[in-house]
Amino acid sequence: GGKVLQTAKWNQEEPYNNQTPVINGKKTYTGCGATATAIIMRYNMHPDVVTKGVSSYNVRGVDYSVSYAPYQWDKMPLNYNPGSYTDEEASQVAALMWHIGANVKMDYGVIGTVGSSSNGTDIAEALRSVFEYSPAVRYVYKSDYRWEDWEKMIRNEIDQDRPMLYREPDQQVATSLS
């Protein structure tokens, strides 16, 4: 047993998707990339507010407004069990998920059909340019590393209290470096 980072245990449906687009009257998933990114952002409680994000996002021909208010990280619990959270807590996490989705160019999918998807390079770029994370945030491929170096890099991130987005089965990772 190595070090374990205590991160949020969130998913892609209610209340997380309360602000994602509705397509043909049906709710959409937040997307695994947006959810994982939100969990990392909640762990870091950063940023305080977005000042460089998109103001609208087009999903299947419909423009959706994106408005930003300061994040209230303390109103985003690590767990959203049914009946255990307030409307304000639901609204806070839903806004975060929508902000991420719009800024990573999420391809939204309707619940029960196809999932919502995003590109890892778009996530890394949004973390750097929109959400004001370190310019060292990067998207890397396991195939570019020897196993020992890959394992060492991941262990170092965890040891430095830096959760990362890890994507399977491609075994690619976007890391947040201070």
Language-model features and meaning:
Residues 1-117:
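Active-site-adjacent structural segments surrounding the nucleophilic cysteine of cysteine proteases
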Residues 29, 33, 123, 175:
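Hydrophobic (often cysteine-bearing) scaffold residues that line and stabilize catalytic clefts
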Residues 36-43, 122, 126-130:
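Amphipathic alpha-helical segments that form well-ordered structural scaffolds
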Residues 90, 108-120, 128-129, 138, ...:
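Flexible, surface-exposed loop/gating regions in the mature catalytic domains
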Residues 125, 129-178:
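Active-site-adjacent substructure of cysteine-protease-like catalytic cores
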